[in-house]
Design a protein with these regions (language model features):
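Bacterial signal peptide processing site
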Residues: 62-65
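Intrinsic, low-complexity polybasic segments
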Residues: 8-17
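Polycationic, low-complexity disordered segments in secreted or periplasmic proteins
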Residues: 79-91
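Primary mode marks residue(s) on the alpha4-beta5-alpha5 output face of response regulator receiver
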Residues: 103-166, 171-309, 316-443
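Intrinsically disordered, low-complexity proline-rich regions
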Residues: 88-100
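C-terminal motif of bacterial Sec signal peptides marking the signal peptidase cleavage site
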Residues: 58-60
C-alpha cells in the first residue's frame, strides 16, 4: 500500500520537490487503483524521521477512466512544511439560524444558490507556492486536501433539519459549527474548518465508528479528492462528440446530498463504490475488502484501516436537494453503449470527490458504524451501512480558483494547492494521529 517516506523539508506553504504525478489506467468496471510514488532525498529523510515516521493515506479514485492518485502527497507536503502555521480563531458565529426546510427549492442557475462571500478576507488564508504539474496522462484535473475529525453529534441537517438529536450519531468534518440547524447561509456565515481552513466551510459527515467497547473511534484523518474532466475537453463540452459524457459545470453552491447505503430504504443497492483498505508497516499491498469484518481479519493491529466512498458526479441541473436527498444527483455508467456518461435525467457533470476515512486499529477492538445496528437484513456485515453526507459551502473566490486551475487546466493539485501559485494554509491544528483517539458515546 501507500507508505511513503517523508522527503524534503520546505519553507511553510511551499510544495516539496518530487511531488507524485497521477497515473492513468482504463477500468470500465470503475474499480479503485492507487498508483503513486515519491522518491525523497535521503539525508533530508533522516532529519525528518526524528520528527515524524511515516505519512500515509489513500485517496482512491472512482471515475470514467478508473484514474488513481493518492492523497499521500498531501501529507508529505503538509508534514514537510505546515507544522509552524499560526492558528487563528474562527470568525464570531452568527446567531443560531431558524430551522431549515426539509428540502430546498429548485435552483434557478447552474451555479446553484447565490454565492455568499466570506466574512473575512480569504487572501489571509492562502500562502504562496509553485504551480503544480500537469495531471497528464490522466484525463481529469485533481484537487486534494486533508480533513481532520471535528464534532460528534446526533444531528443531520439534511435528513432532520431543525431537529437536534434526531439522527443516529455522526462524525463531522469541515465546518465546526455544522449541526441540525445548518443551512447554506449559516455555513457560509460562520465557523472554522477541520478541512485545513475556513475558506472551506462545507460540511461532510459519516456515521460514527464504534470500537465495540462503548467508545467512538475518531479518525486520524480524512482524504478528499475532487476530480472532473476540464471544461475544454469535448467529452464534457461538445454534445456531438461520440463519447459525450454530459455538460461539465462547476460544483453548485449549496448542493447537498447523501451517498452510499440508503438508511431510509435499506432494500436499495449500495452506491459509492465503497471499499475498505489496510495501510501500514505490515499491511498487505493493495489490499481491498468489502466491510469491516474482512478488513479487520486482513489488517494487523497497529496498521490503519481505511473506508473509502465516492460521491455522485452527475446532477439534474435544477435541485440542490430532493425528498430522498439522493435523486437530484446520480452516477454515470457505461451501460450498453461502451463509454462512460451521465443519465439523460442528470445531464450535468460536476466535480465528484472520493473520501477516505483512516483510523488506527487497536488490540481487542471490534469496529462498526453506529448505523450498522439499523440493518437487520440476513447476512449483513459490520461496515455494510457506510454512507456519507455533503453540504457544499466553499468560499466563492477560492472555489473558483481550484475549479479554474486544478480542474480545468488538468493539474495535479495536492495539499490544498489551488493551481495558481497559491495554496490553502493549514490553520486547523494538525496531527497525523487522532488525539484523543477514543471518546465516550454521547448519552
Amino acid at each position: 500500500m501507500e507508505i511513503e517516506l517523508l522527503s524534503k523539508a520546505r519553507p511553510s506553504g511551499l510544495r516539496a520537490p518530487g511531488r507524485a504525478r497521477s497515473k492513468s489506467s482504463i477500468n470500465n468496471k470503475r474499480s479503485y487503483a492507487t498508483l503513486q510514488g515519491i522518491t525523497g532525498n535521503k539525508s533530508a529523510t533522516r532529519r525528518l524521521c526524528s520528527i515524524v515516521a511515516l505519512a500515509l493515506a489513500v485517496a482512491a479514485c472512482r471515475g470514467e477512466t478508473g484514474n488513481a492518485d493518492s492523497a499521500s502527497a498531501d501529507m508529505v507536503q503538509l508534514a514537510a512544511g505546515k507544522k509552524s502555521k499560526t492558528i487563528r480563531p474562527a470568525p464570531a458565529p452568527d446567531p443560531a439560524p431558524a430551522p431549515a426546510p426539509a428540502v430546498d427549492t429548485s435552483s434557478s442557475s447552474l451555479e446553484g444558490a447565490a454565492p455568499i462571500a466570506s466574512n473575512f478576507d480569504p487572501a489571509i488564508e492562502l500562502a504562496a507556492t509553485s504551480i503544480p504539474p500537469s495531471a497528464a496522462p490522466d484525463v481529469v484535473g485533481a484537487f486534494r486536501f486533508i480533513c481532520l475529525p471535528g464534532q460528534i453529534k446526533s444531528d443531520d441537517p439534511i435528513v432532520y433539519p431543525g431537529q437536534p438529536g434526531r439522527s443516529h450519531l455522526h462524525q463531522f468534518f469541515g465546518n465546526d459549527t455544522a449541526d441540525a440547524n445548518s443551512t447554506y447561509a449559516s455555513l457560509r456565515g460562520a465557523g472554522n474548518s477541520s478541512c485545513m481552513s475556513p475558506v472551506n466551510r462545507s460540511a461532510y459527515w459519516i456515521p460514527a465508528i464504534l470500537n465495540g467497547k462503548g467508545s467512538v473511534v475518531r479518525p486520524d484523518y480524512v482524504t478528499i479528492y475532487y476530480k472532473r474532466r476540464p471544461l475544454s475537453d469535448p467529452i464534457v463540452s461538445d454534445p456531438a462528440h461520440p463519447q459525450y459524457q454530459g455538460k461539465g459545470i462547476k460544483l453548485p453552491n449549496g448542493l447537498k446530498f447523501i451517498f452510499g447505503r440508503d438508511m431510509l430504504n435499506l432494500s436499495q443497492p449500495q452506491t459509492g463504490a465503497i471499499s475498505f483498505s489496510c495501510d501500514g508497516p505490515t499491511a498487505v499491498p493493495q489490499s481491498s475488502y468489502k466491510n469491516f469484518e474482512e478488513a479487520q481479519a486482513g489488517c494487523a493491529v497497529g496498521n490503519r484501516i481505511g473506508a473509502r466512498i465516492s460521491a455522485p458526479d452527475c446532477w439534474d441541473g435544477k435541485n440542490l436537494d430532493s425528498p430522498d436527498h439522493r435523486s437530484h444527483v446520480a452516477y454515470g455508467g457505461y451501460g450498453g453503449w461502451g463509454y462512460y456518461k451521465c443519465p439523460t435525467t442528470h445531464p450535468y457533470v460536476i466535480p465528484a470527490f472520493t473520501m477516505g476515512v483512516w483510523f488506527t486499529q487497536a488490540q481487542g477492538e471490534v469496529y462498526s458504524f453506529v448505523s450498522d445496528s439499523m440493518d437487520t437484513s440476513a447476512g449483513h456485515k459490520r461496515g455494510d451501512t457506510f454512507h456519507a453526507d455533503f453540504f457544499m459551502a466553499w468560499d466563492p473566490a477560492v472555489h473558483d480558483m481550484w475549479e479554474k486551475n486544478c480542474i480545468d487546466k488538468m493539474l495535479n493539485c495536492s495539499a490544498g494547492d489551488l493551481g495558481n501559485g497559491k495554496q490553502i494554509k493549514q490553520t486547523w491544528p494538525h496531527s497525523w494521529t487522532a488525539s484523543p483517539r477514543l471518546v465516550a458515546i454521547p448519552s
